[in-house]
Amino acid sequence: MSWQHSVPRITEDERQLRLSKLRQGIEGEGLAGVLLGPTESLRYFTGLVWHPSERFLGALVTPSAISYIVPGFERSRVETLPHLPGEILLWEEEESSAALISRLVGQGGRLALDDGLPLYFYHALAAAMGAERLADGGRLIRGLRRIKSAAEIALIQYAMNLTLDVHKQVHALLKPGIRSSEVVDFIDRQHRQAGADDGSTFAIVSFGAATSLPHGADGDQVLGPSDVILVDTGCRIDGYHSDITRTYMLEGGDREFERAWRIEREAQQAVFDAARIGAACASLDDAARKVLAKHSLGPDYRLPGLPHRAGHGLGLEIHEEPYIVRGNDTALAAGMCFSNEPMIVFPEKFGIRLEDHITMTEDGPRWFTDPAAGPTEPFA
């Protein structure tokens, strides 16, 4: 595995820069602050990783400070976890974390909320400080998160390289008679052995007609000698995701599949070619559908054809902005990273999804992983 090298890391200096940009947004919009919940946005800005529960834990970012809002009995644990320096403020079991936040914000200021916060906590804050003082912080937060830094792109690249290597090992493993559950277990083991955060974040392994279901079928499957194979999997490195899909057959000769595979690859290439700085995300989805329409597939979301959007952003979340979908007029910018996967579904027969990811540079699009070479050659 010649791609292996030291794993890139997000430094404290980079997190401080992110925080500085967030504060610029806070001041620019006349906010008292932004409240981050136990979401990937908390990790993005502060480095603190926390799994959500009914007890609120998060961070209040103001123009001059960062304060961590922590259940009293969790203080010692939080102090041991990596996070940017800031005051730790405690609330006890009989107290209201929403009331504590209201006191910190003070009178009159508006508080922008992490859009990953649960609805029940929004209601608690509205009761404590008034709904008119709450604002949606999602646009500000996600506007920063969707432009990846060089370090973030390096982490995604590392994760993609790792998963592509696992895909190659799967291809070598597959033979008629193997069960999909065996392959899923193998994928997880290989990701773990290669150093992924928690093994596979997911693994979809489908054979035959099950490949026509975009997210796979329930139950175990056995690979037949003439089955179409779809493998979609990914992992995380320091929180950043990979996500790659390959669809292929072990032997050639199925003309219907091979023709459909080449249409899929043509559509995938059309998305790449349409990816230009300033282009609307929707235009990439349109490019894929034009290819399919040329081959009498679709139109729109009709089957046989493409039943879903052509791609999604990824980073600390496997699905995040920007979304490559109709109606999204977000302009592509350098640093954006997103999938290219205009799947073609032939109901109850087979589906073909070739998924590779793109990062936008000042000079245009760049593949994280080279596209598949052919219907029986899943790697370049």
Where would I find each of the regions flagged by the language model?
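Active-site neighborhoods and metal-handling regions in enzymes and metal-associated proteins
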Residues: M1-A380
